[in-house]
Amino acid sequence: MPAEAEVQEIRPAAAPASRARVLVIANQKGGVGKTTTAINLGTALAAVGEKVLLIDSDPQGNASTGLGVARAKRKTTLYDVLMGEKPATEAVVATDLPGLFLIPADPDLSGVELELGNQSRRSFKLRDALEQIRREGDFTYVLIDCPPSLNLLTVNAMTAADAVLVPLQCEFFALEGLTQLMRTVELVRGSLNPALEIQGVVLTMYDKRNSLSEQVASDVRGPFGETVYDTVIPRNVRVSEAPSFGKPVLVYDLKCAGSQAYLKLAREVVVRERQRRKAAASKQEV
């Protein structure tokens, strides 16, 4: 059975369409599994029945490449959208996986900050561009993969998002990177997007043989409590190999520990989102 078909078999009946939940996958520290999480969480959410749009906001375009979308296929990219040359709906391309779609990146994204200069609402370009997709599309999740730095692309992503999902590598300086990100979130809340939430923190590259991983997990769960997902993403060679083949790990090796962890994370994200919506609806009724 082809790997794509094997992943598709996981899918239950899709839930009724509703306004998309926009999550920015962000961490200002590099090498934490940010793009890997964006690719594989997006794939896993699609595998469990959600309709997902992944936006590659990193000029390196690793999320686009990791989903097997070659540069030659990127006719319209996020760059065209942010510059106002094309609507976001024209930039959406289907991947090989049912339920997973992509707005690809372009190296020209690295010049967006200079090109937009002092334009009004330059921090709202992505938010404005996504409004039609959020209002009329039937996506249940929009995931935005950001560059590992605080620049106009990251600010646009946070301004457009409902919440931030933070991948956190189980290493010594993990909390330092998380603290920096929380400061950025507070800055964005204060001036651009007061409703921005923390969706959750996911521990990545966890090695149960290493006492440091357990210590970092404990140190993060202490102050952040239930914000930290129960699911941890293990350090797994198959997860590392998959991008070089232009495939999410769930397609590359569905049965490996990394794939199973991302499926578990996707289910946890969906359950938490249902609980959040139920709580929000209850507040409105009061």
Which residues are covered by each model-predicted region?
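P-loop NTP-binding core
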Residues: 1-286
